[in-house]
Amino acid sequence: PKELNKILKDDSSEKPFIVDVREDDEIAIASFSFSVLHLPLSKAANWSAKIGELLPKDQPIVVVCHAGVRSLNFGIWLLEQGITKRVWNLVGGIDAWSTDVDQSVPRY
């Protein structure tokens, strides 16, 4: 989380495209203060066929969830589908973001 925060604040670094795979009820509890693409995994049938259109080809992608497990699996899927070669998982998810970077983000 601290490394991502540093990248987001550094004007000279390439900004990642952030995908949040948590569910709607989780987003309602805790959300990031910056822009993310929300793709809840439970609704993958609605967006999986057009995933290549939803994600940028020229930006690194950071995938997030609550603790980092669902986002890790989604990141692996993106690699397997050939969608991107530059994908990272936010280890610890929004929970770690809350403890390590922004304590105003509620924990659940």
Identify the residue ranges that each predicted region occupies.
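Rhodanese-like catalytic fold shared by cysteine-dependent sulfurtransferases
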Residues: 1-17, 24-60, 69-108
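Short, surface-exposed ligand- or partner-binding patches at beta-edge/loop junctions that are enriched
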Residues: 64
